[in-house]
């Protein structure tokens, strides 16, 4: 147990260092963008006195390092200031949008994870068959297709031509859970098509590799039924790489959802980021980017911990 806690602590410490470095990059990349924030807020007709007063109010008259430390302190307390465009709290705005993104990611994961594992095992058992070749072509096509392309294809056939689902994933207060699932089905399906292909191929490769192991051959020679060979002998040793790839794809579901949210006009954090960039709402841009980075690092940490817990060789590296 001590070895596991030590490894987790090292991963956590490394993640915090990486997040700190990313926070520096995010802040100063925004600082380097052309234009004057005060001018953007007040407009071209603002007087020099009003511009100077707003710069003092926003702390723009202070050195960049001082402003970074102030912003970082607020970020640690989940206080990202106020939106330049709306004046609303960035934390509240981003919090609502992030909750919507988490729901969409969870919706897609609930479908993609079991489907990809089951299909990966079936394809591995039917290696080199027609089913395997068809699955290989379909997954490669899905992986190579951009998310926005898949999204527009689904909109064309499932929304425009058939009218089965709405083309825009609009949400409203008081919506019941069934309607919520219905309205967000197309963006969730778009994400499912992308991540299922990745996870299915990894599961297939892992199972095929394990089926060639000596202990699997021994189990077969003993007359163990094929399903029992998979469930009792192959899957327990396949969980480490499978859990790792699942966690990494969950990270993608949250951080790579921007294009999907834009295509379906879904009110998530990705859509908020795009809107903020177009309106030069820098506090929202900084907050959204930092949340994306923190989420990705956290899920990578979860992948590392899952791999450690399911692989004895990682638990006892010596």
Task: Please give the residue ranges for each predicted region.
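Hydrophobic alpha-helical transmembrane segments of membrane transport/permease proteins
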Residues: 18-69, 162-183
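Hydrophobic alpha-helical segments of integral membrane proteins
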Residues: 4, 12, 50, 54, ...
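Alpha-helical transmembrane segments of integral membrane proteins
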Residues: 2-7, 16, 98-131, 147, ...
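Juxtamembrane/transmembrane-helix interface segments of polytopic membrane transporters
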Residues: 22, 26-30, 151, 155-159, ...
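Residue-level recognition of pore/gate-forming positions within transmembrane alpha-helices
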Residues: 15, 23, 45, 140, ...
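Membrane-water interface segments at the C-terminal ends of transmembrane alpha-helices
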Residues: 25-32, 62, 70-73, 137-167, ...
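An internal, D/E-rich "acidic patch" concept
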Residues: 1-4, 61-117
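Charged, compositionally biased N-terminal leader segments and the immediate start
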Residues: 1-29
């Amino acid at each position: 147990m001590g070895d596991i806690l030590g490894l987790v602590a090292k991963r956590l410490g490394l993640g915090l260092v990486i997040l700190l470095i990313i926070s520096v990059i995010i802040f100063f990349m925004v600082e380097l963008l052309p234009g004057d924030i005060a001018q953007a807020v007040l407009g071209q007709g603002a007087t020099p006195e009003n511009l100077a007063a707003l710069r003092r109010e926003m702390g723009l008259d202070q050195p960049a390092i001082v402003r970074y430390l102030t912003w970082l302190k607020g970020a640690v307390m989940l206080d990202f200031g106020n939106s330049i465009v709306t004046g609303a709290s960035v934390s509240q705005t981003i919090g609502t949008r992030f909750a919507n993104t988490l729901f969409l990611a969870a919706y897609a994961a609930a479908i993609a994870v079991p489907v990809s594992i089951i299909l990966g095992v079936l394809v591995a058992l039917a290696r080199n068959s027609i089913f395997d070749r068809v699955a290989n072509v379909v997954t490669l096509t899905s992986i190579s297709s951009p998310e926005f392309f898949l999204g527009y294809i689904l909109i064309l056939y499932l929304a425009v031509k058939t009218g089965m689902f709405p083309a825009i994933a609009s949400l409203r207060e008081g919506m019941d859970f069934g309607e919520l699932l219905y309205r967000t089905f197309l963006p969730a399906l778009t994400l499912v098509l992308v991540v299922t292909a990745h996870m299915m191929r990894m599961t297939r490769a892992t199972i095929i590799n394990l089926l060639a192991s000596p202990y699997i051959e021994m189990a077969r020679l003993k007359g163990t039924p094929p399903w029992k060979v998979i469930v009792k002998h192959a899957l327990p040793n396949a969980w480490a790489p499978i859990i790792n790839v699942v966690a990494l794809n969950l990270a993608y579901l949250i951080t790579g959802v921007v294009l999907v949210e834009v295509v379906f006009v879904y009110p998530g954090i990705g859509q908020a980021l795009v809107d903020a960039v177009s309106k030069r709402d820098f506090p929202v841009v900084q907050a959204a980017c930092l949340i994306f980075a923190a989420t990705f690092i956290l899920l990578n940490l979860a992948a590392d911990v899952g791999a450690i817990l399911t692989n004895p060789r990682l638990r006892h590296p010596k």
